[in-house]
C-alpha cells in the first residue's frame, strides 16, 4: 500500500531534475548570433568601407530582442578561417529550437563558378579580411567565402536547430562584381561608399558549364542589401550599412510585421536614401514559412 506513493514521488523528482537541466532544448529559448563586420582588409586594393561600424548597432538591436549569446568578428578577426571556425562553433553549440542570427557587413564580390550551380557563371562571395581583390599567387580564390561554402555551414546550423528553430542570415554587402545589368543611375554622389568590387575574381581555366549542377533552396531566410547583380552603398551621413541601419530602425519601431511588410519597408528605405545606383533589398529562402519578426521579438523582463 505504501509503495505506490514512493514510486510516484520518484517519478516526479526525475521529471523535475530533467526540466532543470534541459529547459533550453525543450523550450527553445536560446537566441544566438554571430555578427561579422569589416572596415579594413589585408589587401589594400580594396576600398575603405565601414562594415565594422555596423557591429555595435546590430549588437544593440539583438540585445533588445532577447539574444543572450552574441559573438562578434571584427576586421582582423574575420579571416576566412576565423569566419568558418566561428560558424562551425556556433552550430555545435546550438540546440533544437534555438533562434540563430548571422550577420555579415563587408565587401562582396562575384567570382568564377567552379561547380556549375550558377546560371550566370559566377558565385557570390563574402570577402574575409585576408581575401585578395584580384587572382594572384597569394590567393587563387581559396580565401573567398563562397555561397556554396556558406550553404554547407548554414545547413549544419539548420540541422542542429531542427524544424522548430529559426535561422536568419543578413548580408549587408555587394554581390554585383563586374555585372552591370540592372545598375540604373539614380544620382551623382561620387563620394558614396560602395561595399563591393566592380571586377570579377576570375580563376583561369576553372569555370564550370553554366547551370550544370543546379542550386539547392535555402532552408533559412536571407535578407540581402541588394540583388546579386546590384551594388550596395552605405548610408553616407552615418557611415554605416543601409540594410543594417534600416533593420535596426525597423525593429526598434515595429515588432509584428509580416515578411512582405518587412521587404516593402526596406525597399522604401533604399528609395528614400538612394546611392549612385539603384539597389533592391530582398528576402529569399523560407520566407513563406518562417516569420522574420519572430526572430526580433522584445525581450521579456528577467530574460
Where are these regions (language model features)?
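Bacterial N-terminal signal peptides that target proteins for export
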Residues: 1-11
Amino acid at each position: 500500500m505504501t509503495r505506490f506513493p514512493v514510486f510516484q514521488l520518484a517519478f516526479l523528482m526525475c521529471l523535475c531534475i530533467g526540466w532543470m537541466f534541459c529547459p533550453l532544448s525543450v523550450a527553445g529559448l536560446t537566441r544566438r548570433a554571430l555578427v561579422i563586420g569589416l572596415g579594413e582588409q589585408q589587401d589594400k586594393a580594396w576600398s575603405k568601407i565601414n562594415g565594422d561600424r555596423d557591429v555595435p548597432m546590430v549588437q544593440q538591436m539583438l540585445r533588445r530582442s532577447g539574444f543572450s549569446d552574441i559573438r562578434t568578428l571584427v576586421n582582423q578577426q574575420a579571416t576566412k578561417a576565423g569566419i568558418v571556425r566561428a560558424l562551425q562553433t556556433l552550430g555545435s553549440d546550438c540546440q533544437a529550437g534555438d533562434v540563430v542570427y548571422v550577420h555579415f557587413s563587408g565587401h562582396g564580390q562575384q567570382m568564377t563558378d567552379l561547380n556549375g550551380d550558377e546560371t550566370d557563371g559566377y558565385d557570390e562571395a563574402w570577402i574575409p579580411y585576408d581575401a585578395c581583390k584580384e587572382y594572384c599567387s597569394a590567393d587563387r580564390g581559396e580565401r573567398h567565402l563562397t555561397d556554396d561554402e556558406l550553404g554547407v555551414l548554414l545547413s549544419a546550423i539548420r540541422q542542429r536547430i531542427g524544424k522548430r528553430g529559426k535561422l536568419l542570415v543578413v548580408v549587408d554587402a555587394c554581390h554585383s562584381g563586374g555585372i552591370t545589368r540592372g545598375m540604373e543611375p539614380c544620382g551623382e554622389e561620387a563620394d558614396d561608399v560602395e561595399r563591393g568590387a566592380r571586377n570579377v575574381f576570375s580563376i583561369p581555366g576553372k569555370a564550370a558549364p553554366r547551370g550544370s549542377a543546379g542550386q539547392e533552396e535555402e532552408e533559412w531566410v536571407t535578407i540581402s542589401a541588394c540583388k546579386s547583380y546590384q551594388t550596395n552603398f552605405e548610408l553616407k551621413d552615418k557611415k554605416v550599412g543601409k540594410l543594417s541601419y534600416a533593420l535596426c530602425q525597423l525593429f526598434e519601431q515595429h515588432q509584428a510585421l509580416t515578411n512582405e511588410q518587412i521587404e516593402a519597408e526596406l525597399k522604401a528605405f533604399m528609395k528614400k536614401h538612394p546611392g549612385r545606383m539603384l539597389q533592391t533589398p530582398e528576402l529569399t529562402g523560407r520566407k513563406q514559412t518562417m516569420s522574420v519578426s519572430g526572430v526580433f521579438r522584445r525581450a521579456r523582463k528577467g530574460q
